[in-house]
Amino acid sequence: MERIVEREVSMKILSFGSLNIDYVYKVSHFVKKGETLSAEELNVYTGGKGLNQSIALSRAGMETYHAGAIGMDGLFLLDQLKEAGVNTDLVKILEDVRTGNAIIQNDEEGDNCIILFGGANQAISKEQVDEVFEHFTNEDYLLIQNEINELPYIVKKAKEIGMKIILNPSPMNEKIKELPLDQINYFLLNEIEAMQILDMEEPKEIDGKYISGLLHQKFPEATIVLTLGSEGSVCISGDEYVEQSIYKVKTVDTTAAGDTYTGYFIAGILNGKTIKEAMDTASKASAIAVSRQGAAPSIPYLEEVEEYKN
């Protein structure tokens, strides 16, 4: 089976993304319109898709640099990143803006719904972007999501340098379509995000092979990884098509499932694994993550994943 990347040089990953404080409420059910609901429990965690994916990459063995912005109330987020081995020198601390945060409801089934406040995540400046990219070369990779501003400029700067770009278009909205998507090297996304990029109406039944095939037709030079929840994941890269089932566990909290998968898949590929090997490792890591409470704290270390038996 083809190995996409042979790691012959020292490469770095720049995760230019969000840094959030997560307020997680344990509830019997998601609150409805007009309803006042008492939470059974409140926990405060570090979060943000950018932070989660940086931690997943680092715990999976990659040299990871995080760029982004926080307010003075978010200094503890830097400690979490540093503890995971992520370089935080490129995170800007803003005195007059609050750190981004998320209000997360977790129900009895382990599902969640999330309200985001952008805060410092929406205060990225072009000057900061210019400063960040001074530290990277065409040997390096950029990972982005959709929780910060200035994404088109970030992609432009990365391409000027010659970096390869990995996109996780979450949360999905019209801003994603403002990006030069034909310049993306890796797409990691779920079926809903994929259908929105394709301007498809949601079908009665999700066909991962069909949807990923349409994406591959639209972006033939990119590697497409489509996550399908309980149905696993599929990947198309060149002429290769691979399917991966999930590892079944008791679900506690799905918040970091996708972020864990993203980090571990990318780390696997860049460390020379085949697509199948990288998908299998990512699925194991994601299974461990959903069996635990919290976002960043639930992301496993590589040693745990390698020892995992279902």
Q: Which residues fall in each region the model found?
A:
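Substrate-binding N-lobe of the ribokinase-like
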Residues: 4, 13, 33-101, 303, ...
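Short glycine/proline- and charge-enriched loop/turn segments
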Residues: 31-39, 190, 242-245
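Ribokinase/PfkB-type carbohydrate-kinase core domain
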Residues: 7-16, 79-93, 105-242
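Active-site metal-binding loops of divalent metal-dependent hydrolases
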Residues: 19, 49, 260
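Positively charged, low-complexity intrinsically disordered leader regions
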Residues: 6-33
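Short, glycine/serine-rich, charged loops/turns that create anion-binding
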Residues: 20, 71-74, 108, 119
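Residues that scaffold the ATP/ADP-binding catalytic core of kinase and kinase-like folds
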Residues: 24, 115, 196-198, 289, ...
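Conserved phosphate-binding/catalytic region of the ribokinase-like
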Residues: 3-7, 174, 205-310
